[in-house]
Amino acid sequence: FLNPFRWVINKYR
């Protein structure tokens, strides 16, 4: 998994 996906999931949460 890439790092960019980290904030993406955080925002979707």
Curated annotation (Swiss-Prot):
Answer yes or no on keyword Transport. no
> Could you name the Gene Ontology cellular component terms for this entry?
extracellular region
Tissue/organ expression: Expressed by the venom gland.
Name the source's superkingdom.
Eukaryota
Q: Which UniProt keywords apply?
A: Secreted, Toxin
* Any one Gene Ontology molecular-function term assigned to this protein's record: toxin activity
Q: Does the keyword Secreted apply?
A: yes
Localisation: Secreted
Q: What is stated as this protein's family in its record? A: Belongs to the cationic peptide 04 (cupiennin) family. 06 subfamily.
Please identify the protein, giving its name as recorded.
Short cationic peptide-6c
Organism the protein comes from: Cupiennius salei
